[in-house]
Amino acid sequence: MSTSKSENYLSELRKIIWPIEQHENKKFLPLAFMMFCILLNYSTLRSIKDGFVVTDIGTESISFLKTYIVLPSAVIAMVIYVKLCDILKQENIFYVITSFFLGYFALFAFVLYPYPDLVHPDHKTIESLSLAYPNFKWFIKIVGKWSFASFYTIAELWGTMMLSLLFWQFANQITKITEAKRFYSMFGLLANLALPVTSVVIGYFLHEKTQIVSEHLKFIPLFVIMITSSFLIILTYRWMNKNVLTDPRLYDPTLVKEKKAKAKLSFIESFKMIFTSKYVGYIALLIIAYGVSVNLVEGVWKSKVKELYPTKEAYTIYMGQFQFYQGWVAIAFMLIGSNILRKVSWLTAAMITPLMMFITGAAFFSFIFFDSVIAMNLTGILASSPLTLAVMFGMIQNVLSKGVKYSLFDATKNMAYIPLDKDLRVKGQAAVEVIGGRLGKSGGAIIQSTFFILFPAFGFIEATPYFASIFFIIVILWIFAVKGLNKEYQVLVNKNEN
């Protein structure tokens, strides 16, 4: 009897630690490996792209890249994807897009990166044009280092195309609903484990003691890893199509039904929906406020990171460390987030994100505005300079804001849709995706880039007081929006219960 109980206990423990059935490993493990490779590239690209742009062009250029290059490129990429869907089958689309990224990584690694003087315009010409046209100097500087700008854009598109679109489309196609409940939680843990691995890889290859290649080509091994990873993604995808999608135990094509088209609204229709429904408007305001406030702090923080770590290698190593902490904090929030939601009210759970942003943002900006006071009173005690402390608090703010997003912010936002009637829920969510998604991601960059165009003599140092003021105004509006949405939410919940 005791043996039977012990076996049952071990069986239950195994289901908690590894909820995948033995026969499902053939499907889950290659899918998980694909996701790991995609995320290894994703987190490596995120660390490197800023290192090139910030140190060679300037931190201010990031807002211009996001607004005027990345956003249009994402739209063009989606148009091309839709066209490919009309002429190729899904498997071949995956090969075409992944091969495009692989080809670009090879081109950048062996041509654009090693020979910048051959591909970039003359530095003196760019400087003279920047002085002649100060309002457009950041556009001119971006053109002057166009290969780094293209790398930044491709890095941004990798996350959108490879992870959000191709991987999840494939996973959703071949994963049954009963499997998804167990598979997807494990994917979440795996996704965040790729971040610490990236940190270790970057730290090793860019360390000054690692002498695999010449000093001016330190990034080559990282590019080779990304190229290899891209090859492995293609090979794994091919193997799954040959061995998993042909196994009736793991995939039944008759169960793949045509899904009803999601409600799609135009930009104008989305605006009308948000302005005519106070409830939907509040949800949109939450998403916009999150995106804009994160971008405003992130821009200032990266300018301070550049001051502390002025070289490409040092900056990239630091961003790798940032990914390390972000990965573990995200895992921690994933584990505790569901418990928080079960034990507190919707209002309390929804308030955690803006209050955390306000407190950490206030600490970050305090170390910038009062650096001389801190230097006199705290530097000796804390054995750190005001700049180091500002960078540290900026990292804490960014790590927490991204960690809390996936566990609490997204969960409370999605809960807010539940009490709505079906028509408003479907159309409202579509409207929020169009307006909130676009303005949230690009809103902060638009504010910053417009500011630098109107005031060309300003950099982040001079503009920080203005960006800080906008940040606090937006977070306060966010808090009021949460309170307003909670009132509407409680009315609908009580109405539905009665």
UniProtKB/Swiss-Prot annotation:
Q: Which residue intervals are topologically Cytoplasmic? A: 1-33, 89-92, 169-184, 240-279, 342-348, 401-438, 487-498
Q: Where in the cell is it found?
A: Cell membrane
In terms of SUPFAM superfamilies, this protein maps to: MFS general substrate transporter
Keywords of the record, alphabetical order, are: ATP-binding, Cell membrane, Disulfide bond, Membrane, Nucleotide-binding, Transmembrane, Transmembrane helix, Transport
A GO molecular function held by the record: ATP:ADP antiporter activity
Q: Which Pfam families match?
A: TLC
Topological relation to the membrane, as annotated: Multi-pass membrane protein
**Which family does the similarity line name?**
Belongs to the ADP/ATP translocase tlc family.
Q: What is this protein called?
A: ADP,ATP carrier protein 1
Which organism encodes this protein? Rickettsia typhi (strain ATCC VR-144 / Wilmington)
> What does UniProt list as this organism's lineage?
Bacteria, Pseudomonadati, Pseudomonadota, Alphaproteobacteria, Rickettsiales
